[in-house]
Amino acid sequence: MSSEEDQPVKIEIPEPLPSPTPEQRALKRKRAIKQRLWIYGILFTVIYGGVWYQPYEVDWIPRRIPNPNPPVNPDTSRLFAKGTKVLVVTAHPDDSEFFIGGLLSQLAKSGANLHQVICTDGDKGYYFFFTNAAKNRVVRRQEARNAAKAWHAQSLKFLGYPDRFLHANDEVIAKISDEIEQFKPEYILAFDGDYPPRASHQDHRRSGDATKIAAQKTHIAKWLLLFSTIAPNYIVDITNQWEDQKNLLAIHRSQFFGSHLEGVENMVEYSAELDGTRGGFELGEGFRCIQIK
């Protein structure tokens, strides 16, 4: 007798699946293409949206610094004289303290007559994805008032444009021109729109462009001192004003606090060290001076 172990094992071979028809293959290709398009579309939207939303402009081809670029003396005896009228035009509420806090401290102590114009309310701030723009606008305006009071600004004007969308158009130029004509400054401090850092906020560049045009159009101020520039021809020694500048930065509590404040202080100090080296000082602030008349 044969046991069950001796019985042959029957292996069932499944019937081959029918080959897809040309119509089925075409439908499968269409579905795959649609899936890829969805994925590429999402990636493109995220990348393009991020590039569009971020506020910085980058000069992929570096701008050439003027050569020669000799030192310029913007009549410093008059700049630091008591009663000299100085107009400060910035893009955001914290720009003046961040970029030229040392010079402003010196001008305040010398008795200058200071007036400030802020083009946008900085309502997006540094945390624009997670901020309440309306609330931030109120907070940042108050911080700007507190800071301006600390460096003895006689007046402060908000133009009220939205953060990140400033343009050097006729309207902005006209408003800055009005401020120049009313205040009649001898000196105007503004961003350098012609020779900015390679990567810088677009509002900084546009406010600088608009201010330069307004200054040349009105032909009232004698000197235009442009900061945040890669082509400085005048360096202010701010070694003794560093503590003052740190105190000014700390006023903007909504933007600079905790470890972020320390990081911002280090960033500003590093920039001041670079400018100071150009002028032979421990710390400095660089300006590109243009004589208007």
Q: Residue ranges of each PLM-predicted region?
A:
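The feature marks non-catalytic terminal segments
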Residues: 5, 9-25, 29, 40-57, ...
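Active-site rim/loop-helix segments in enzyme catalytic domains that contact anionic ligands
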Residues: 14-40, 47-183, 213, 217
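Short beta-strands and strand-loop turn motifs
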Residues: 157-160, 188-193, 226-228
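Active-site adenylate/phosphate-handling loop in enzymes that bind or generate adenylated species
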Residues: 175-223
